[in-house]
Amino acid sequence: MDRRLDPGLSPYRTFSRAEWAALRRDTPMTLRPDEITRLEGLGVHLSMQEVEEIYLPLSRLLSLYVAATQKLFRAMSYFLDSRDSEANGDGKMPYIIGVAGSVAVGKSTTARVLQALLARWPNTPKVDLVTTDGFLLPNAILEREGLMDKKGFPESYDLPLLLRFLTDIKAGRRPVRAPLYSHFFYDVMPDQYVEIDRPDILIVEGLNVLQTTRPPKDGKAIPFVSDFFDFSVYIDGDEDVIERWYVERFMRLRATAFKDPLSYFHRYSQLTEEQARATALSIWRGINLPNLMDNVLPTRQRADLILRKTGEHEVAEVSLRRL
C-alpha cells in the first residue's frame, strides 16, 4: 500500500536520498565505525553511508534549530526584563526532540544515532535519551484492567506521569526521574529510575508520542505530549515491510534473549521455527498492526520530519515540514 505524501497537497518539502545527502555540506563525520556498530538495533544494520547521507544532514539541521531556539529564548528573557525563573542556571531551556513510529521500525536506533551526533556539536554537549516504555502502566495494573493485549496502545500509559515529567524538564527542574522499563522482564521496574539532569537536548522516543485526543467542548486546555516537543521525527515504512522486520526481530530474540529462563518470553524459545513465525505474525496482526493503523500512523502528519524507510532499513526519502 503506497502511503507517500502527495507533493501537491503536502505541507512538507520532500527530498530524495541524494538531495538530502547534499545538505550535509561540510558537516564532519564525528563517529568511528565501531561507534556506529554499537548504535545498531536488533536486526537494524546501520552503515557509515547511512549516517553520512541521512543522519549527518539531520544533525546539522537540528543544530541550527537548537541554536535558533536558544537565541529566541534569550530574546524572550530580555523582553521580560528578567531571567526566566523556569530556565536552567545557564539560561538555557532544554530542547526536546520526539521520535515516533511503529514497533520494529527502528525508532531506538534513530534516537541513539541522533543522541551520539548531537552530543558532538559544541552548543549541545549534553544529550539525554528516554523512552516512553518506562511510562507504561505496570503489568499488574494492565492485567487488572484487562489491558495486557493493549500494551503499547495509548490507554496503557501513565499519561499524567509522562506529562509531569516533561513539564519538569521544560521548567528546568533538576534532577528529573523517569521510570525504568525492562524488555527482558516486559515490565516497569519497581523503584528503579533514570535521572535526567539539565540536558541541552532531551530525545523522547516512543510509539505514541505524537498522539492527541479530541479537545473538550468547553475549550479547557488539555496538554499533549507533543506540546512539549521543539522538533519531532516520524519513522515511516510500509506495513508489510514493518511486519517482516517484526517477525525477523522476534525470531532473533527467540534464539537469544528468550532462551534465558528468567525472560518473560522464555516460553517462545521452546517453539519450533514454524510455530514461532506463526506466533510472531499473530502478535503483529492482532496487536501491533491495529495499534499502528489506529493510533500511530494517524500521527505521522504531526511530525516535523518524516524518514521513509525501504525494506533494508535504509532511508529512501525525507519529508521536512515547511516553515
From Swiss-Prot:
Pathway: Cofactor biosynthesis; coenzyme A biosynthesis; CoA from (R)-pantothenate: step 1/5. GO terms for biological process: coenzyme A biosynthetic process. SUPFAM superfamilies: P-loop containing nucleoside triphosphate hydrolases. Its EC number is 2.7.1.33. Pfam families: PRK (PF00485). It is found in: Cytoplasm. Signal peptide: none annotated. This is Pantothenate kinase. It comes from Xanthobacter autotrophicus (strain ATCC BAA-1158 / Py2). The gene is coaA.
